Design a protein with these regions (language model features):
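Extended, low-polarity transmembrane helix blocks
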Residues: 2-52, 70-78, 82, 89-193
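Short juxtamembrane and helix-loop transition motifs at transmembrane-helix boundaries
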Residues: 54-67, 80
Length: 193
């Protein structure tokens, strides 16, 4: 397999044809490594708390229909951790990326189907903000707490949905195209799943 199997850079279509070899042999492979590392290491980072407490999400996974929680909670934690490492180095990239993409798609569904509430501040919290807000928060921060924090929660909800969409898309991309030319799959195994 060559580094240009996935995407082609024909000289006839390039404005700077002499750059084709650079793109094929360096820029494209390096971009694959960077993208794989971004997706994989983000999965590892997000899994660390789950690895430290593997049964902590048992109730949550059961609440969305995955029984028994004592199985699914640690399974998903280790899938995210081991899969993240495998994706980052490009080992069995497609199956690990697909498995994590399914998990991330469920996360996306959860964020869309179960939005944050209208407010997160209690009446005591609102009273505190009214008593001495200038000592604690900037005017811009205070604007997020109007109506019990609705503007703040709207921002949190939007970020949760967009990040879930981005990570799901990244994992699906790697599941579809593999780990790229500088991956364990291609360099050592010489095959892809």
């Amino acid at each position: 397999m060559s580094s240009s199997d996935t995407f082609q850079n024909p000289k006839s279509l390039m404005i700077l044809p002499f750059m084709g070899k650079f793109y094929d042999t360096f820029a494209e492979p390096l971009a694959w490594v960077g993208f794989r590392a971004l997706i994989g290491l983000a999965l590892v980072y997000e899994s660390i708390a789950k690895i430290e407490a593997p049964f902590a999400q048992a109730g949550f996974v059961e609440s969305i229909g995955f029984y028994p929680g004592w199985f699914w909670s640690p399974f998903l934690a280790y899938l995210q951790f081991v899969g993240g490492i495998a994706i980052a180095i490009g080992f069995l990239t497609r199956p690990f990326a697909l498995a994590n993409a399914v998990m991330l798609a469920i996360t996306l569904w959860f964020h869309v189907a179960h939005p944050y509430g209208d407010a997160f501040l209690t009446s005591a919290g609102m009273d505190f903000l009214k008593s001495a807000p200038q000592d604690v928060f900037t005017p811009a921060a205070l604007s997020l707490f109007k109506g019990g924090g609705t503007p703040f929660l709207e921002q949190v909800q939007e970020k949760a949905e967009l990040l879930s969409l981005m990570w799901t898309g990244g994992a699906l991309f790697l599941a579809a195209f593999g780990g790229g030319p500088w991956s364990v799959d291609r360099l050592l195994i010489k095959r892809e799943f």
